[in-house]
From Swiss-Prot:
UniProt-recorded name of the protein: Probable GTP-binding protein EngB
Residues noted as binding GTP in the record, renumbered to the chain: 33-40, 60-64, 78-81, 145-148, 178-180
Positions that bind Mg(2+): 40, 62
Source superkingdom: Bacteria
InterPro entries given in the database record: G_ENGB_dom, GTP-bd, GTP-bd_ribosome_bio_YsxC, P-loop_NTPase
Membrane-crossing residue ranges in chain numbering: none
Protein's gene: engB
Biological process, per Gene Ontology: division septum assembly
Tagged with keyword Nucleotidyltransferase: no
Cofactor field: Mg(2+)
CDD domains the record matches: YihA_EngB
Source organism of this protein record: Hydrogenovibrio crunogenus (strain DSM 25203 / XCL-2) (Thiomicrospira crunogena)
Length: 212
């Protein structure tokens, strides 16, 4: 199961800050989340490309803003993971500065896919991201990642709790369960990306039947 647009994603460039980003036009959707929430794995599954975004067992390896081009108008963007403590303080501040510059200034940014581990409640920094994007009026779609590690009941409970929080405080955000390992939730996240990218999938033509 592949998506006709996102399977075409190819690495474009990495930028340490806003001034090194590609030209600001078209449609971009950025992927954000805590450094161990499964962001790179999700990107690889969504694009059906195992090695597109580099995964690592060491959280915090994504230190640059990484751009992947789907077509001439549309890009996916892998943002630096936030909230990881075991990095140099100056490095951490530089990441946060480039992250905030990109999210606040980038006019082609149409939405944010945000990773939250389904096995635990959102952290303080996750909630700060939701508060921040709310003030910017930036749409957010949350992937409750690693949902395959939960049984069906606890997974649904995690989804309902997050949905209730969003309904009460964050009307700009939506949420779904997602598993990179089991490839669960792909259709839902593809539909959200299509909406933000203003992309219509080609309709497969039906073979003509001969009249008798």
């Amino acid at each position: 199961m592949q998506h006709p647009l996102y399977q075409q994603a190819t690495y474009l460039k990495s930028a340490p800050d806003l001034s090194h980003c590609p030209e600001d036009f078209g449609y971009e959707v950025a992927f954000a989340g805590r450094s161990n929430a499964g962001k790179s794995s999700a990107l690889n599954v969504i694009t059906s490309q195992r090695g597109l975004a580099k995964t690592s067992k060491t959280p915090g390896r994504t230190q640059l803003i990484n751009f992947f081009e789907c077509d001439e108008q549309r890009k996916l963007v892998d943002l630096p993971g936030y909230g990881y403590a075991k990095v140099n303080v100056n490095t951490k501040r530089a990441w946060e500065r480039s992250l905030s510059q990109y999210i606040e200034v980038r006019s082609s940014l149409k939405g944010l896919i945000m990773m939250v581990d389904s096995r635990m409640p959102p952290t303080e920094i996750d909630l700060m991201m939701l508060d921040w994007t709310l003030t910017l009026n930036l749409p957010v779609h949350i992937l409750l990642t690693k949902s395959d590690k939960l049984k069906k009941g606890p997974a649904q409970n995690s989804l309902l709790k997050m949905r209730q929080l969003l309904n009460e405080k964050y009307p700009h955000a939506t949420v779904q369960l997602f598993s990179s390992l089991k490839r669960q939730g792909l259709d839902e996240v593809w539909a959200k990306l299509d909406e933000w990218m203003e992309y219509e999938r080609p309709v497969k033509s039906q073979p003509e039947t001969k009249e008798s």
